[in-house]
Structures are given as C-alpha cells and as structure tokens.
Amino acid sequence: MPIRIDKKLPAVEILRTENIFVMDDQRAAHQDIRPLKILILNLMPQKMVTETQLLRHLANTPLQLDIDFLYMESHRSKTTRSEHMETFYKTFPEVKDEYFDGMIITGAPVEHLPFEEVDYWEEFRQMLEWSKTHVYSTLHICWGAQAGLYLRYGVEKYQMDSKLSGIYPQDTLKEGHLLFRGFDDSYVSPHSRHTEISKEEVLNKTNLEILSEGPQVGVSILASRDLREIYSFGHLEYDRDTLAKEYFRDRDAGFDPHIPENYFKDDDVNQVPCLCWSSSAALFFSNWVDHAVYQETPFDWRKIEDDASAYGYL
C-alpha cells in the first residue's frame, strides 16, 4: 500500500531501500480515491526506529494512507532531537479538530510508574477521550493497551516477578475473526514488559473479546466486537534485533537481565537472533487496516462523531 508521509522523514530512505512504496503529496493528489487518515501516537523513546517499524507494516496493503505522528506536548523526549519532533510531529491541540480513520498508540517505557504519575497522563487521558468521537478504530500496543484498559474500564496492571522478554507462542481463539484472517491456529510474537493484566478483570469489567492468548504471555490481543478498539500486549512490529538491543542496553546498565527466551540460538547472545513473526505481523496490520478501518470507517470523517459505539462496555 502506498503511504503518504513527509518525504524528508528519515524513515523514507530506509523504506525505499526495502522496495516499500511511499509517495509525496504531489503524486498522491493524482489518485482519485479518499486516503485513510492514520494517526500514530509515538510514545517510544527511539522515535525514528518505531516510525520505521510501524510504517513498514502499514505499507502492506493496496490502500493509500495519510500518516500523521503525534507526541505528548507535556513530555520532553530525551532521546530524539527536538528538531525532529517539531518537523515531523503534531501536538494534540493541532489535531483535535480533525478526524482520523485509525490511530495507533505505541508502548512506552513507563511501566514502573502508577499511571497517574506518568508526566503526560492528563494529556493522554484527554486524547483518549477525544478519540472516541474523532477516531474510528484505535490499536493500542503494550503500555498503550494497559493504559487504555485502565482509563476506559478500570482494568489494573500488575508487576510480574521478572521481565517477560522473548518470542512466545499464542493461540488464536476466534476462528475466522477478521483480525486473524490468514493466521494459523497459533503464532509467535515478541513480548517485552514488566507488567501484565488480569484475564479475570477483563472478563468481569469489560465486554471485550479475548482473541489470542498464550501460556507464558496470558491475554495477548483483545478487541471490542465492532473493532473500534483493539489491545495488543505484544510487539508484532518489532525488528529482528529489537529485543537484542533491549537486552544489551539493560545488561550494560548493570540490570542483569534474563536472555530473551526462544530468541538467540542455544541462548548464545553472539548468534543472530531469530525472526519468526514477520509474516504474522504483516497479516495483523493488514487485517487491521483493511477490516477494522477501511471497510468500516465512514466516507465522511465527520460522521465518526455520530457513529455511536458501545465499545467494550458491559
């Protein structure tokens, strides 16, 4: 799928070397179709890495997407230059009068904090409330999923005894579900987190469907029945070496991390790590764009505000 982004974005050159179709405004203007508007709230510290990971997967279906990046104005990034943020990102006040067909909320390295102690929490809360009437389908990832469940349903996150890090199997639970079209009965994906949610709380506090789970990871992906909200606790978007970089970063910082499970051959960190989830990732993101966004979003964006949804409320 062609994605329309600022041609100066550093990710563009990387994507073009991978034969991924990106277009600028001039070329996009000659396509006589309405593009889908996708907003990405990027809360990850390595902004450019996450941009490339997500754009790589969003460029996987034959639909034109207009991508906007959003950042929390109440938080100052320590790892990405302010020039990059000012050039390629928008603030919430700049987008709050717009409508979007889809939104992705990434993870964030703030699991150790209570939600209310995150410095951008109030801004995040306002943005999530706004999304109910201005975004058709929202895909929450990792901490973004935990935060969304907490704000909307009061589902808590719980500290795990040790970090969950590695490539883990999950079973698909709803045969024929649109988000898992083309999937086998089971698949693997990266997980990297210190906290988890309670399946019992999800069942007792929400009307969300649990779509996949695994023995090590617990609940992995759940969604409202109308696919207006989707929660994924893994990282299908990760590159081959993302978990390795996290491991070496933590090791060099003196944290004595566990070697990511099912990742390095024979647990030898000098080996090239496996890549065994890319086809599942491609399918998942394509299914989200095609079935949750493209086939359901109204042609007139303003009707999103009038399109009432029960979401996952009981």
From Swiss-Prot:
Site (Important for acyl-CoA specificity): 111
Main location: cytoplasm
Site features described as Important for substrate specificity, chain residue numbers: 192
Gene3D superfamilies: 3.40.50.880
Example of a GO MF term: homoserine O-acetyltransferase activity
Uppermost EC category: transferase
Residues given in the record as substrate binding sites: 163, 192, 249
Pfam family for this entry, one: HTS
Catalytic activity: L-homoserine + acetyl-CoA = O-acetyl-L-homoserine + CoA
Pathway annotation: Amino-acid biosynthesis; L-methionine biosynthesis via de novo pathway; O-acetyl-L-homoserine from L-homoserine: step 1/1
Keyword hit for Transport: no
UniProt KW Transferase keyword: yes
Any one Gene Ontology BP term: L-methionine biosynthetic process from homoserine via O-succinyl-L-homoserine and cystathionine
Record key words, sorted: Acyltransferase, Amino-acid biosynthesis, Cytoplasm, Methionine biosynthesis, Transferase
Active-site residues per Swiss-Prot or TrEMBL entry: 142, 235, 237
Subcellular location: Cytoplasm
Entry EC number(s): 2.3.1.31
Protein family membership: Belongs to the MetA family.
HAMAP family, A to Z: MetA_acyltransf (MF_00295)
Role played: Transfers an acetyl group from acetyl-CoA to L-homoserine, forming acetyl-L-homoserine.
Listed name of the protein: Homoserine O-acetyltransferase
Organism of this sequence: Streptococcus pneumoniae serotype 4 (strain ATCC BAA-334 / TIGR4)
Gene it is expressed from: metAA
